[in-house]
């Protein structure tokens, strides 16, 4: 994920302009990723959200997933849970910028979608949430003043599924440092094959938070009020 298409240079911020907030990844099981329309339920497999910086001032000095994204030159290591059933999936990766989120509709959503095929011996088919509908503009992790002294942060959306990953924001090295839920052992390791990646992009204004769903016809970044 990078604000400049195809750019992975550390000389350029992946998300600039103090766009601090969480990085979340969802997946959705579909019959055929090449024709899926994004209406199937999505479950969360990864999140890198917030951690307190004891030496900082307000929440903007704290550790955030988007800061890790910048530190890693726009790349985030995300492990596909090994317990997932094989087949086609849509993958929704999003960064939520909270620098203007002190009032409703101030958060900004940057979303990328992929079509992937998972292979392996897993059997889990987690329940999910729908987009639009999973977020509200007034959710505590979406409408928040990050410039105050934060004691905690509530990540938007559902919990990470068993076998997914909850990263520790601000950790040295790879952003992936902690496992969310209880991983389920499988006899054969799960692998991922990217079957199709949508390359077109457009800014889609919304007013309800997370109203953009993954679709094979578009790969977009969406903003609550259509602005950066």
Describe each region flagged by the PLM.
Residues 80, 85-87:
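A glycine-anchored, Pro-Gly-centered beta-turn/N-cap motif
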Residues 89-93:
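A short tyrosine-centered beta-strand micro-motif
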Residues 79-80, 97:
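Short acidic/polar micro-motifs centered on Gly/Asp/Asn
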Residues 1-23, 30-75, 98-228:
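Peripheral, solvent-exposed domain-edge segments
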């Amino acid at each position: 994920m990078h604000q400049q298409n195809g750019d992975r240079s550390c000389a350029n911020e992946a998300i600039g302009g103090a766009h601090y907030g969480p990085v979340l990844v969802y997946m959705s099981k579909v019959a055929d990723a090449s024709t899926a329309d994004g209406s199937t339920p999505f479950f969360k497999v990864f999140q890198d959200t917030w951690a307190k910086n004891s030496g900082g001032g307000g929440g903007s000095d704290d550790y955030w997933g988007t800061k890790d994204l910048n530190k890693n030159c726009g790349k985030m290591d995300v492990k596909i849970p090994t317990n997932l059933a094989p087949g086609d999936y849509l993958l929704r990766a999003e960064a939520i910028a909270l620098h203007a989120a002190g009032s409703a509709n101030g958060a900004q959503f940057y979303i990328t979608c992929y079509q992937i095929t998972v292979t392996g011996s897993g059997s889990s088919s987690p329940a999910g949430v729908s987009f639009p509908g999973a977020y509200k503009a007034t959710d505590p992790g979406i409408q928040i003043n990050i410039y105050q002294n934060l004691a905690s942060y509530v990540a938007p959306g559902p919990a990470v599924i068993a076998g997914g990953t909850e990263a520790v924001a601000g950790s040295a090295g790879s952003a992936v440092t902690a496992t969310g839920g209880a991983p389920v052992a499988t006899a054969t390791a799960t692998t991922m094959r990217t079957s199709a990646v949508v390359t077109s992009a457009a800014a889609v204004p919304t007013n309800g938070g997370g109203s953009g769903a993954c679709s094979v016809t578009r790969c977009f970044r969406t903003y609550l009020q259509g602005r950066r």
